[in-house]
């Protein structure tokens, strides 16, 4: 069993949602740790990589056991499914960056509010459609996939390459990224 370190490099603003709002100011806030720093939840990474493995399996032969070991298998009425054998940590800023940002009180500079509104067919904004979301500026975060079976390392590396966008609005220009294996 091996731990695989990875890095997510964001090339555009990104938003992993917390499910919270800031009253009348912002409709959707970014998920943050107790120090107010952004991170990508491990379950988000796991879901994206599972989706990537599923897409990849349409082009190359991937053993179902490998997908089940890495991501688990959901159950149904006839089968209880199975849990994955690996664990995905949250992807966070590197320790040096965290310490610098916190000690210099720079957390507020990591975020931007972006406003949008719905436009009618006649080109005029719809009433009451203004929405503001908080986004994180482009940066890099790091995570670990723990307890990876040696025979699944190559599949995991291939799924990293498949992910090109992450988070809210990933089909509208937010969250453009690259995931790469470290070390």
Task: Map each language-model feature to its residues.
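Short amphipathic beta-strand starts and helix->beta connectors
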Residues: 116-132
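RNA-binding basic/glycine-rich loop and surface signature characteristic of RAMP-family CRISPR effectors
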Residues: 1-111, 128-183
């Amino acid at each position: 069993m091996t731990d695989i370190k990875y890095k997510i490099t964001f090339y555009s603003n990104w938003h992993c949602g917390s499910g919270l709002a800031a009253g009348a100011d912002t409709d959707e806030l970014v998920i943050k740790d107790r120090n107010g720093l952004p991170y990508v939840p491990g379950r988000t990474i796991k879901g994206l990589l599972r989706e990537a493995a599923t897409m990849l399996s349409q082009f190359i032969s991937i053993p179902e056991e490998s997908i089940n070991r890495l991501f688990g298998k959901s159950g149904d009425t006839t089968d209880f499914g199975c849990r994955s054998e690996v664990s995905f940590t949250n992807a966070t800023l590197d320790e040096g960056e965290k310490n610098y940002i916190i000690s210099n009180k720079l957390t507020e500079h990591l975020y931007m509010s972006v406003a949008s509104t719905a436009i009618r067919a006649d080109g005029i904004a719809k009433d009451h459609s203004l929405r503001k979301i908080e986004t994180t500026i482009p940066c890099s975060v790091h995570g670990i996939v723990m307890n990876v079976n040696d025979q699944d390392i190559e599949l995991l590396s291939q799924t990293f390459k498949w992910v090109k966008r992450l988070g809210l609005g990933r089909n509208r220009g937010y969250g453009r990224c690259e995931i790469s294996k470290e070390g």
